[in-house]
Amino acid sequence: MGFAREMRREPTPGEKALWAVLRAAQTGARFRRQEPIGGFVVDFVCLPRRLVVEVDGERHDNARRKEADRHRDEVLSGLGFTVLRFAEWDARCDPIEVADEIWSHLPGNRRVPSVYEFAQE
C-alpha cells in the first residue's frame, strides 16, 4: 500500500495529464489511480468495468521490461481485466485522444465533453 501511495504523490507528467482528463470527464466511469491489483500497482483502473490503463515511459522500451509487462498483462487478464497500454508521450501530449480510446473500451458509456476539453480550445 505504501508504494501505491508514493506513486499517487509523484505521478509522471503523462499520468498527471491523463488523470486530469479522466477526473473532469462526465462518463459515469469512475477511475482510481495507482491501485494495487493482483500483486501489481496499476496506473489507472475502472473496477466496475474491469479495465486497467497503463501509461508506459521509456523504461518500458527494452526487451526485459516488455516481457515483464506481458506477464503482468496476462495475470491481470486472468483476473478478468482488460489492459490498455499507452505511451507516456501520448498521455502527456494528447491526453484527450488517449481518454477517447479508453472510453471506446467502456461499452454503453456515454461520454460528455468536459470543461477541461473546452478550456483546451
Predicted regions and their residues:
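Basic, amphipathic alpha-helical patches used to engage nucleic acids or provide basic targeting signals
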Residues: 7-11, 17, 33, 38-107
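Solvent-exposed, charged helical/coil patches
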Residues: 1-29, 78, 107-121
